[in-house]
């Protein structure tokens, strides 16, 4: 099964609309063919309309970094998945470790968000990953497997096949430490095996699994060479146009 690689940059809480506009203008015409690789940027909510407007007609996919699981109502400070779709958003990142840690998001919240994203015609990038303590205790596979199963519960096989799952070991995010090629392959295969157990091998063969955690232009090719790594969710190295383009210049 040939899965199209997907490299997505997560800007986190960086860039104002002017900076976002300059970035997209710098990369839009230089992106590789969408037949070869999918390129995306997860922009802060206040940058989304700018990024979507400048990216229009290019190969750049646009993701939100979060949404709520209701479309409207008395939910002060939340972002509506319905409105994200209306403005043209393609993907929504959910379950990032920073959201789980700082904002106390649960597996149940993430599952509800996944359902809301599909209900509104977008696709989720579902993040999972273990702490250093869990990793060193040898419980990474068990922990991540439970996160994946919980996030996908109640989705249809078709929805799961269209999902993107990003494995990001928490101990490698923004720390300069990165998982070895073997670790990345092993854990991305764990993700795929959990999908196979829950939804069947055919679905597991279609779902795209990204690795995230200190991915840079210098190491992206080694991760992309892994049979179960279908892309990367990249933080710091996606903030500069030149670096983002270099991430896309790998040979699978």
Swiss-Prot record:
Record: active site: 96, 168
Binding site for substrate: 10-12, 174, 214, 235-236
GO BP, sorted A to Z: gluconeogenesis; glyceraldehyde-3-phosphate biosynthetic process; glycerol catabolic process; glycolytic process
Enzyme class, spelled out: isomerase
One CC-aspect GO term: cytosol
GO function terms (MF aspect): triose-phosphate isomerase activity
Localization (cell): Cytoplasm
Subunit structure: Homodimer.
Name of the protein described by the UniProt record: Triosephosphate isomerase
């Amino acid at each position: 099964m040939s899965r199209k690689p997907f490299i997505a940059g997560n800007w986190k809480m960086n860039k104002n609309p002017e900076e976002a506009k300059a970035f997209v203008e710098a990369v839009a015409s230089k992106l590789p063919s969408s037949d070869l690789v999918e390129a995306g940027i997860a922009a802060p909510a206040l940058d989304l309309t700018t990024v979507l407007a400048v990216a229009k007609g290019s190969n750049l996919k646009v993701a939100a970094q979060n949404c709520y699981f209701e479309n409207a109502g008395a939910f002060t400070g939340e972002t509506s998945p319905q409105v994200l779709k209306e403005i043209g958003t393609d993907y929504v990142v959910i379950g990032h470790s920073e959201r789980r840690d700082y904002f106390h998001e649960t597996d149940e919240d993430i599952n509800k968000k996944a359902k809301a994203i599909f209900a509104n015609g977008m696709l989720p990038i579902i993040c999972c990953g273990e702490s250093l303590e869990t990793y060193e205790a040898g419980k990474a596979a068990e922990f991540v497997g439970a996160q994946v199963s919980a996030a996908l519960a109640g989705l249809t096989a078709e929805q799961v096949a269209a999902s993107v799952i990003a494995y990001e070991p928490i101990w490698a995010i923004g720390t300069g430490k990165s998982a070895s090629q073997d670790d990345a392959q092993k854990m991305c295969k764990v993700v795929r095996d959990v999908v196979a157990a829950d939804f069947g091998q055919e679905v597991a063969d279609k779902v795209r699994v990204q690795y995230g955690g200190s991915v840079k232009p210098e190491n992206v090719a080694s991760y992309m060479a892994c049979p179960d790594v279908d892309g990367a969710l990249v933080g710091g190295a996606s903030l500069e146009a030149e670096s983002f383009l270099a991430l896309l210049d790998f040979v699978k």
